Amino acid sequence: MAEPPADVIALAQQRADARAARDFAAADRLRDEIAATGWVVTDAPGGGFTITPKPPYDVLASIRDLPDNSEQPDTHRATVSVLVDGWPDDVRTCVEALLTHTAADVVVQALDLGNVDGAGDALHEMRGDRLQEWHVAGPAGWSDARNALLRAETARVHVWCDLSTVFTGDALSPLLDAIDADDAVVAAGWRGVNVDLADEWRSFVPAPAGDVDAILGYLFAMRRSAALAAGGPHPKARFYRNADMEFSFALREAVPGARLVVPPGELPCRQDRHRGYSDSDPAYRDKESAKTYNRFLQRFRGRTDLLAPREDGG
């Protein structure tokens, strides 16, 4: 990689000094001045900064710079939303499959968080009319990123897709059809789970097709209006795990009589390595997962009115 010239390094140091003095207006001005020279400065964890060549796409300073279109009317049928935080080969596999196996009225929306290992570059390789790409300079928590994408788009149905979920055919249309079939259906997904009442809400169990208590975030389609009414995922959910189940119940609470369903039959998709679980720091993963589940219990435990109907009537 080319080394930045001395004058750019000097500007970056001035920016770091301005940030330390909390002169953020000056820091922003210096950041833009650096960008005009063809370089990008990024704050490093624990202090300091890195300087890299400016990529062939716009990079926003943070997810707060994404547009807020939450008050705008629906403009198309669905948007499939993907978070990109590394693993460029996974990005290519997942996004190419989405573009290949979804209809022309479906937009694929991806948020690149810091171009980790060139994942943002891999995303940009697939640019086109149906790919809406956002690039920000650094990382963001799971909920913050998901909420930014929800507010930025204007589809009738907003879809979470994990990078580990790879379409082998049109796995989206059955979910959209399930939502279209009944106004009470606010969400449909690939895999559903039910609260284990025998375990006093301390766990969930896999659910068969039909009405379910919660949908897992591997592939989770939701009415945008319902997702916005629920306030999006909880702002304290910094990690994905258990946040999908928490949000499922938030949808139910926000929309009286809401149904969440898994359509019958096997969807044409597969799950590759789930990086969020398998390649995250175990201590961080377990800590944040427990925080989210405890928050779920505090808010929803005992709310049997929010459960899907059981075959035994319970």
Spans of model-derived segments:
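A recurrent flexible, glycine/aromatic-enriched loop bordering the glycosyltransferase active site
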Residues: 204-222, 240
